[in-house]
């Protein structure tokens, strides 16, 4: 099985572009690749999914223990001919930017993956070799196995490749030339989402066409035994229903928002909910007039509601449907953008304020910079639908908007010690800015149990 991780010295080097080009080329060759993303990012996996037509998975060593990450990787890679993981940020950049914990290197070390280093030869030549050697020597083993040059002219590649191999001892495997017609646009949370780029498939095809690669060398460096799937670890124990429970009750319908405004979901979270007994019912707060009928729960994930605030506000029937359902006690989870949607109002990118569902007291407003960005540990103050008092869960925040009332149900603490209160929770509700990673936790089981109880009560009336 072909397995490798794509990394770079820093963000903006072209990891996503190279990863998409490699995935598309491997798919053309019939390798049936699957893909992964290190860290908590939602957007890059959307591009992987656009290339492959199947889900991409996040692997995060802050969210999950090493054995859980290995199990998730093995499960998702099973049956595929190639597994390609895209690293996050710089190769060694982990918690708080001052640790290699949860970095791309940490993931490569945990999974034993060879690493292909993406380098952009902008204004440097021999100095690139010095930088690469520094990365090689910084940790042992570095797992660096090969070099890919991005945004590189053919004549420059012919000059740099033999020099880099001589000076670093690494194999230079290929390059992607300058492709202005295939550039992926960005905005405040990173790249625009895959669904917003109308000609994305043409761009992906252009990348794959232009990719120059020594495939024989790549396969020699990256081919190895497929990871073993440890069935006793999949799904993690916290997600397992009681023995025979699946036969005792039918699947519980849970409405999940999915459209341009609500698109930040982890594949592992959705899979964990399904393993816990949920039937996922997709709906669009932008387009649909009401929630799906006869549901037992509601999941409002993050996304970009601030970019669609006017359209969301204009869909009054959906806002009323959500408000009635939550006030009736429908088990509900709302993360980040979903949390803003449940507030009183939301300011859009132009500064105009729009009425929202009105379930929560806060008003969402634009800050213009990242707010409380990064990893944190969430500690519950009291028992609720998802949490038990004193329970801690690793979470992530990534937003340029804030609320006038973030709640006080939890304490969030960053690795650097900074703390703040946040979140709303009761016996049928969770809402807050933190993004939750559900795989390997008790959350899926608790949410589905609450949804099943509510669904049964509704049917009995």
Predicted feature descriptions by range:
Residues 113, 170, 327-331:
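A short helix->loop->beta-strand "cap" motif at the edges of active sites that frequently abuts
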Residues 5, 84-86, 116-118, 148, ...:
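Structural motif
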Residues 250-316, 320-327:
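Phosphate-binding active sites in nucleotide-utilizing proteins
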Residues 305-384:
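Cysteine-nucleophile active-site neighborhood
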Residues 2-111, 119-146, 151-158:
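ATP-dependent carboxylate-amine ligase catalytic core
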Residues 37-38, 172-180, 279-287:
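Beta-strand->loop->alpha-helix junctions that form or flank phosphate-binding loops
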Residues 108, 262-274, 279-281, 366, ...:
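C-terminal and late-domain segments of enzyme folds
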Residues 125-246:
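Internal gly/pro-rich beta-alpha loop/helix module
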């Amino acid at each position: 099985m072909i397995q490798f991780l794509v990394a770079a010295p820093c963000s903006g080097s072209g990891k996503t572009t190279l990863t998409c080009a490699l995935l598309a080329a491997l798919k053309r060759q019939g390798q049936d690749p699957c893909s992964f993303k290190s860290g908590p990012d939602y957007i890059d996996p959307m591009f992987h999914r656009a290339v492959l037509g199947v889900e991409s998975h996040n692997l995060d060593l802050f969210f999950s223990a090493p054995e859980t990450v290995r199990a998730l990787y093995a499960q998702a890679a099973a049956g595929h001919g190639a597994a390609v993981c895209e690293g996050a940020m710089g190769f060694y950049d982990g918690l708080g930017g001052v640790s290699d914990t949860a970095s791309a290197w940490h993931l490569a070390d945990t999974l034993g993956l060879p690493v292909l280093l993406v380098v952009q030869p902008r204004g440097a030549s021999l100095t690139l070799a010095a930088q690469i050697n520094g990365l090689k020597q910084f940790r042992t083993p570095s797992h660096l196995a090969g070099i890919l040059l991005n945004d590189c002219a053919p004549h420059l590649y012919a000059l740099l490749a033999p020099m880099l191999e001589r000076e670093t001892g690494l194999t230079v495997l290929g390059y992607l030339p300058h492709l202005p017609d295939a550039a992926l646009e960005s905005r405040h949370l990173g790249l625009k989402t895959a669904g917003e780029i109308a000609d994305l498939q043409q761009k992906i095809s252009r990348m794959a066409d232009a990719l120059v690669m020594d495939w024989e060398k790549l396969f020699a460096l990256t081919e190895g035994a497929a990871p073993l799937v440890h069935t006793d670890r999949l799904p993690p124990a916290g997600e397992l229903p009681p023995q025979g429970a699946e036969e005792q009750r039918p699947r519980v319908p849970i409405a999940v928002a999915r459209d341009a405004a609500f698109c930040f979901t982890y594949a592992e979270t959705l899979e964990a909910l399904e393993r816990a007994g949920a039937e996922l019912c997709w709906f669009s707060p932008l387009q649909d007039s009401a929630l799906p009928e006869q549901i037992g729960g509601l999941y409002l994930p993050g996304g970009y509601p601030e970019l669609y605030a006017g359209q969301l506000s204009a869909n009054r029937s959906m806002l009323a449907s959500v408000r009635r359902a939550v006030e009736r006690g429908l088990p509900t989870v709302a993360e980040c953008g979903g949390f803003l949607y449940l507030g009183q109002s939301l300011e859009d990118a132009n500064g105009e304020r729009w009425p929202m569902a009105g379930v929560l007291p806060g008003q969402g407003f634009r800050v213009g910079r990242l707010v409380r960005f990064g990893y944190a540990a969430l500690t519950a103050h009291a028992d609720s639908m998802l949490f038990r008092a004193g329970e801690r869960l690793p979470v992530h925040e990534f937003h340029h908007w804030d609320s006038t009332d973030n709640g006080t149900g939890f304490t969030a603490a960053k690795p650097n010690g900074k703390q703040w209160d946040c979140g709303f929770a009761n016996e049928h509700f969770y809402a807050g800015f933190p993004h939750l990673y559900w795989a390997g936790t008790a959350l899926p089981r608790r949410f589905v149990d609450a949804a099943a109880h509510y669904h049964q009560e509704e049917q009995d009336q």
